[in-house]
Amino acid sequence: MSERAPVVTIDGPSGAGKGTISQLLAKHLGWQLLDSGAIYRVLALAAIHHDVELENEESITLLAAHLDVKFLTGNEKDPVQVILEGEDVTTAIRTQECSNAASKVAAFPRVREALLRRQRAFRTAPGLIADGRDMGTVVFPTASAKLYLTASAEERAQRRYNQLQDKGFDVNIERLLAEIIERDDRDMNRPVAPLVPAEDALVIDTSDKGIDEVLELALNYINQKLSHNN
């Protein structure tokens, strides 16, 4: 890990726009991108593939320690290609089932510890955009700049519905909303690394903001923090 490489963390709940903004920032700055949520989704999918119970912390932790996952440069539709045990799972990890399973395995303290070093290894020159739920509070507490994106549960459910519809999934928006509210509660109230803004993070409510507006706010803040740190 390069301690000198700057890190910008982007945390927040599911559907707040973290993934989109993170990809745009990484492309704009020419930095590395860490989608930490994808790591937990891959772990959840691996558990499902290997018939490991999602409630079994010991087995999930063992699986996490030996997780065979690679992140490759993708295409415009999927900027990051995710490979699990030699298989392309980029689309498979984006299902709602996988998302819910990821939230369950992410609640285990030993699982989070097992994946901590792997996440920190993404910090390489010229810099890193780290997208997740505890990037600014736990994984990179001394990050150069920290952002926290949020939005109403209703807006996030609508975004998720549109996203899944575009990918050809048949989904129910009422069920999506209920699952988002349930996941928010689970993520925000877990005893280890709960979903909360870092004290020094810039909080942006994206409910009524377009992508360009959020990106401009983020870039202005990042440039300000980087120039101050230098």
UniProtKB/Swiss-Prot annotation:
GO terms for biological process, alphabetical: nucleobase-containing small molecule interconversion; pyrimidine nucleotide metabolic process
Protein's recorded name: Cytidylate kinase
Assigned keywords, A-Z: ATP-binding, Cytoplasm, Kinase, Nucleotide-binding, Transferase
Principal location class: cytoplasm
GO molecular function, one term: dCMP kinase activity
Classification via InterPro entries: Cytidylate_kin, Cytidylate_kinase_dom, P-loop_NTPase
CDD domains in UniProt: CMPK
Gene3D superfamilies reported in the protein's UniProt record: P-loop containing nucleotide triphosphate hydrolases (3.40.50.300)
Protein family membership: Belongs to the cytidylate kinase family. Type 1 subfamily.
Reactions it catalyzes: CMP + ATP = CDP + ADP; dCMP + ATP = dCDP + ADP
Annotated compartments: Cytoplasm
Enzyme Commission identifier(s): 2.7.4.25
Residue numbers binding ATP: 12-20
HAMAP family: Cytidyl_kinase_type1
Cellular component terms (Gene Ontology): cytosol
Keyword Lipoprotein in record: no
